[in-house]
Structures are given as structure tokens and as C-alpha cells.
Amino acid sequence: MRDFVIVGHIAKTTPDFSLEDLPGTSGRIDVLCRCVNSAFMLSHGIRRDVRCHLILMGGPEPKILRFDGSRLRHLNPDERSTAALIKRALSIDASPSWRESTPGIYIRKGDLRSLLESLRDEGQRLYYLREDGAPLSESVSDGVFVLGDHTGMTGDEEHLLDSMGAETVSIGPLSLHADHCIVIVNWMCDNAALRR
């Protein structure tokens, strides 16, 4: 299983944003929508072996959305319809346990630490994407890939990742948009799987 974790530092945790003005009203959920689409979209379908987790930090309490490719339905390649799926998920009451809003989309209360602990307990290896990390190995085909939103990761988040044993890796020396990083990681992992 390949997992992507994107931290949305100002992303709203309530559904009171306009689909007509995502950048201005949602806490930049548009950035996260692009990440979701990059994680799943294929030419004529979606990836079934990927999960994408959005950590929304811009509300009174953080929430986590999980998109699970094995069950995912209704995902289209545009930001607006992806934002509508997020808005629908945010309209249900989140609890400490996962609740499904639409097929393959789940919500729960939680933060980066709680999510990474649960993924690590599944036996997943953690990778933190950062420009100055070690080059991502061409043999990596699965794992948890953690990225920041347009603001990057905070020092506390980087310390947490380090304390949990995340390997800091890079796909190149330049700072790229998170959604572009996801496309590149998917490509690298697809190629690694072919070589096995």
C-alpha cells in the first residue's frame, strides 16, 4: 500500500466554505484537492493501491480525511468536485473512529501524530519529502510519504517525524508543489514495482 499524508495548516475543518472561491474561503483546500487528484488520477481510472490522508489544521480541532483508492467512487479530475466531496465529509460529525461519508472517503478527529502512529502500527515505513533529504531510492515502491502544504512543515512537525523514525528523502533539489511531488513519487514507485 502506498500512502500520502498532506498537512493542511490552515485548511478549514468545517464545511462553511464556497466551492466558487476555494483559495479565499477554505483555508487553501484547493491545494489539498490537487494533491488528492494527483494521488489517484490515471488516464482512464483511478489508482486502487493508494490512500491519501489530509490533515486539516485550520479549525477548532484537527480532523483527518482518508481517501481509500480500493473503495473510492465519485472522484473526478477537477478541484471543485473534489472539494465538494471534502465538504460533504466535513458535514458529518467526526469522532475518534473513522466514519465514511461517501464510498472510499472517511473522516475522524485526529492530528499528524495519531495518524502516523496508526500507519506505523500497520507496518508502514515513513518517508518525509524535503528538498535537502537523501535521494529517494529507486527501489521504494510502497510506504507513507509525508508532505507539507504550500507553507511546508513546521519545526515541531519535523521533530515529530524524526522522533518516529521517518526517513527524510528528496526527489530533487528544487522546491516543488506538493501535488507535483505526489505525481513524481507515484511514477518512481510504479517503476520500482516493475523492476521487482
Swiss-Prot record:
Main location per the UniProt record: cytoplasm
This protein's record includes keyword Lyase: no
Organism of origin: Methanothrix thermoacetophila (strain DSM 6194 / JCM 14653 / NBRC 101360 / PT) (Methanosaeta thermophila)
NCBIfam families (UniProt xref): PRK02135.1
Protein name: tRNA (pseudouridine(54)-N(1))-methyltransferase
EC number(s) stated in the UniProt entry for this protein: 2.1.1.257
Keywords annotated in UniProt: Cytoplasm, Methyltransferase, S-adenosyl-L-methionine, Transferase, tRNA processing
Lineage of the species this protein comes from: Archaea, Methanobacteriati, Methanobacteriota, Stenosarchaea group, Methanomicrobia
HAMAP family given in the database record: tRNA_methyltr_TrmY
Family: Belongs to the methyltransferase superfamily. TrmY family.
Compartments (UniProt record): Cytoplasm
A GO CC annotation given for this chain: cytoplasm
